[in-house]
Protein backbone atom coordinates (compact mmCIF):
# COMPACT_ATOMS: atom_id res chain seq x y z
CA UNK A 1 0.00 0.00 0.00
CA UNK A 2 1.44 3.38 -0.96
CA UNK A 3 1.82 6.24 1.48
CA UNK A 4 -0.89 8.34 -0.19
CA UNK A 5 -3.36 5.42 -0.15
CA UNK A 6 -2.59 4.80 3.50
CA UNK A 7 -3.08 8.51 4.31
CA UNK A 8 -6.39 8.54 2.42
CA UNK A 9 -7.59 5.46 4.27
CA UNK A 10 -6.69 6.98 7.66
CA UNK A 11 -8.38 10.28 6.71
CA UNK A 12 -11.57 8.50 5.65
CA UNK A 13 -11.56 6.44 8.84
CA UNK A 14 -11.19 9.59 10.92
CA UNK A 15 -13.98 11.31 9.00
CA UNK A 16 -16.26 8.33 9.53
CA UNK A 17 -15.46 8.33 13.25
CA UNK A 18 -16.22 12.06 13.58
CA UNK A 19 -19.48 11.77 11.64
CA UNK A 20 -20.62 8.75 13.59
CA UNK A 21 -19.83 10.29 16.99
CA UNK A 22 -21.51 13.61 16.18
CA UNK A 23 -24.65 12.07 14.71
CA UNK A 24 -24.75 9.07 17.02
CA UNK A 25 -26.84 10.90 19.62
CA UNK A 26 -29.84 11.06 17.29
CA UNK A 27 -32.34 8.34 17.99
CA UNK A 28 -34.36 6.59 15.33
CA UNK A 29 -37.27 4.27 15.97
CA UNK A 30 -39.45 1.75 14.29
CA UNK A 31 -43.17 2.27 14.87
CA UNK A 32 -43.45 -1.08 16.67
CA UNK A 33 -40.44 -0.54 18.98
CA UNK A 34 -41.17 -1.08 22.65
CA UNK A 35 -40.52 1.68 25.22
CA UNK A 36 -37.09 1.90 26.84
CA UNK A 37 -37.03 0.72 30.50
CA UNK A 38 -35.93 4.24 31.53
CA UNK A 39 -38.00 6.02 28.89
CA UNK A 40 -40.71 8.52 29.79
CA UNK A 41 -43.99 8.15 27.89
CA UNK A 42 -47.46 9.71 27.70
CA UNK A 43 -48.51 12.43 30.14
CA UNK A 44 -45.33 12.11 32.24
CA UNK A 45 -43.36 12.94 29.07
CA UNK A 46 -45.36 16.12 28.52
CA UNK A 47 -44.89 17.04 32.19
CA UNK A 48 -41.13 16.42 31.89
CA UNK A 49 -40.97 18.75 28.87
CA UNK A 50 -42.95 21.38 30.77
CA UNK A 51 -40.58 21.16 33.74
CA UNK A 52 -37.52 21.29 31.47
CA UNK A 53 -38.89 24.35 29.64
CA UNK A 54 -39.67 26.16 32.89
CA UNK A 55 -36.19 25.36 34.20
CA UNK A 56 -34.57 26.60 31.00
CA UNK A 57 -36.61 29.82 31.11
CA UNK A 58 -35.72 30.46 34.75
CA UNK A 59 -32.02 29.84 34.04
CA UNK A 60 -32.16 32.33 31.16
CA UNK A 61 -33.80 34.94 33.39
CA UNK A 62 -37.27 34.86 31.86
CA UNK A 63 -38.54 37.73 29.74
CA UNK A 64 -38.24 40.44 32.37
CA UNK A 65 -41.79 41.67 31.77
CA UNK A 66 -44.65 40.47 33.93
CA UNK A 67 -47.27 41.09 31.27
CA UNK A 68 -45.22 39.39 28.55
CA UNK A 69 -44.31 36.57 30.91
CA UNK A 70 -47.96 35.77 31.66
CA UNK A 71 -48.72 35.68 27.94
CA UNK A 72 -45.72 33.46 27.29
CA UNK A 73 -46.75 31.09 30.06
CA UNK A 74 -50.26 30.84 28.58
CA UNK A 75 -48.81 30.06 25.15
CA UNK A 76 -46.41 27.52 26.63
CA UNK A 77 -49.22 25.84 28.59
CA UNK A 78 -51.37 25.68 25.45
CA UNK A 79 -48.48 24.08 23.57
CA UNK A 80 -47.92 21.57 26.37
CA UNK A 81 -51.64 20.76 26.53
CA UNK A 82 -51.49 19.97 22.84
CA UNK A 83 -48.42 17.81 23.48
CA UNK A 84 -50.30 15.91 26.22
CA UNK A 85 -53.24 15.34 23.87
CA UNK A 86 -50.87 13.95 21.24
CA UNK A 87 -49.30 11.67 23.82
CA UNK A 88 -52.76 10.30 24.66
CA UNK A 89 -53.48 9.59 20.99
CA UNK A 90 -50.26 7.55 21.03
CA UNK A 91 -49.89 5.81 17.66
CA UNK A 92 -51.85 8.49 15.78
CA UNK A 93 -49.17 11.07 16.55
CA UNK A 94 -47.17 12.27 13.53
CA UNK A 95 -44.17 12.58 15.87
CA UNK A 96 -44.15 8.81 16.27
CA UNK A 97 -44.77 7.95 12.65
CA UNK A 98 -41.81 10.01 11.50
CA UNK A 99 -39.33 7.65 13.20
CA UNK A 100 -37.75 10.56 15.08
CA UNK A 101 -39.17 13.00 17.55
CA UNK A 102 -39.93 13.35 21.21
CA UNK A 103 -41.62 9.95 21.55
CA UNK A 104 -38.73 8.25 19.81
CA UNK A 105 -36.08 10.14 21.76
CA UNK A 106 -37.61 10.02 25.23
CA UNK A 107 -40.08 7.10 25.34
CA UNK A 108 -38.68 4.46 23.03
CA UNK A 109 -35.15 5.58 23.99
CA UNK A 110 -33.83 7.36 27.07
CA UNK A 111 -33.28 11.12 26.72
CA UNK A 112 -31.58 13.77 28.81
CA UNK A 113 -32.61 17.29 29.85
CA UNK A 114 -30.93 18.84 26.78
CA UNK A 115 -33.00 16.67 24.45
CA UNK A 116 -36.16 17.58 26.37
CA UNK A 117 -35.49 21.32 26.01
CA UNK A 118 -35.22 20.93 22.23
CA UNK A 119 -39.01 20.53 22.30
CA UNK A 120 -39.71 23.75 24.22
CA UNK A 121 -41.79 26.26 22.28
CA UNK A 122 -39.79 29.34 21.30
CA UNK A 123 -39.91 32.24 23.75
CA UNK A 124 -40.18 35.67 22.16
CA UNK A 125 -39.86 39.11 23.76
CA UNK A 126 -42.40 40.83 21.53
CA UNK A 127 -45.49 38.80 22.46
CA UNK A 128 -47.97 40.08 24.99
From Swiss-Prot:
<keyword id="KW-1015">Disulfide bond</keyword>
<comment type="similarity">
    <text>Belongs to the insulin family.</text>
</comment>
<keyword id="KW-0372">Hormone</keyword>
<feature type="modified residue" description="Serine amide">
    <location>
        <position position="127"/>
    </location>
</feature>
<keyword id="KW-0732">Signal</keyword>
<keyword id="KW-0800">Toxin</keyword>
<dbReference type="Pfam" id="PF00049">
    <property type="entry name" value="Insulin"/>
</dbReference>
<feature type="disulfide bond">
    <location>
        <begin position="106"/>
        <end position="111"/>
    </location>
</feature>
<protein>
    <recommendedName>
        <fullName>Con-Ins F2</fullName>
    </recommendedName>
</protein>
<comment type="subunit">
    <text>Heterodimer of A and B chains; disulfide-linked.</text>
</comment>
<keyword id="KW-0027">Amidation</keyword>
<dbReference type="GO" id="GO:0005179">
    <property type="term" value="F:hormone activity"/>
</dbReference>
<comment type="function">
    <text>This venom insulin facilitates prey capture by rapidly inducing hypoglycemic shock. Intraperitoneal injection of this peptide into zebrafish lowers blood glucose with the same potency than human insulin. In vivo, when applied to water, this peptide reduces overall locomotor activity of zebrafish larvae, observed as a significant decrease in the percentage of time spent swimming and movement frequency.</text>
</comment>
<dbReference type="InterPro" id="IPR036438">
    <property type="entry name" value="Insulin-like_sf"/>
</dbReference>
<feature type="disulfide bond" description="Interchain (between B and A chains)">
    <location>
        <begin position="41"/>
        <end position="107"/>
    </location>
</feature>
<dbReference type="GO" id="GO:0090729">
    <property type="term" value="F:toxin activity"/>
</dbReference>
<dbReference type="InterPro" id="IPR022352">
    <property type="entry name" value="Insulin_family"/>
</dbReference>
<feature type="modified residue" description="4-carboxyglutamate; partial">
    <location>
        <position position="115"/>
    </location>
</feature>
<feature type="propeptide" description="C peptide">
    <location>
        <begin position="59"/>
        <end position="89"/>
    </location>
</feature>
<dbReference type="InterPro" id="IPR016179">
    <property type="entry name" value="Insulin-like"/>
</dbReference>
<dbReference type="GO" id="GO:0006006">
    <property type="term" value="P:glucose metabolic process"/>
</dbReference>
<keyword id="KW-0301">Gamma-carboxyglutamic acid</keyword>
<feature type="disulfide bond" description="Interchain (between B and A chains)">
    <location>
        <begin position="53"/>
        <end position="120"/>
    </location>
</feature>
<keyword id="KW-0119">Carbohydrate metabolism</keyword>
<feature type="disulfide bond">
    <location>
        <begin position="29"/>
        <end position="104"/>
    </location>
</feature>
<keyword id="KW-0313">Glucose metabolism</keyword>
<feature type="signal peptide">
    <location>
        <begin position="1"/>
        <end position="24"/>
    </location>
</feature>
<keyword id="KW-0964">Secreted</keyword>
<dbReference type="GO" id="GO:0005576">
    <property type="term" value="C:extracellular region"/>
</dbReference>
<dbReference type="InterPro" id="IPR022353">
    <property type="entry name" value="Insulin_CS"/>
</dbReference>
<keyword id="KW-0165">Cleavage on pair of basic residues</keyword>
<dbReference type="InterPro" id="IPR016724">
    <property type="entry name" value="Insulin-rel_pep"/>
</dbReference>
Amino acid sequence: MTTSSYFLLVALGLLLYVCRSSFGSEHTCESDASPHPQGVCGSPLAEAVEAACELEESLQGGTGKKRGRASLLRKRRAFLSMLKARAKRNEASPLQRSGRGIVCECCKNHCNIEELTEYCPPVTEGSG
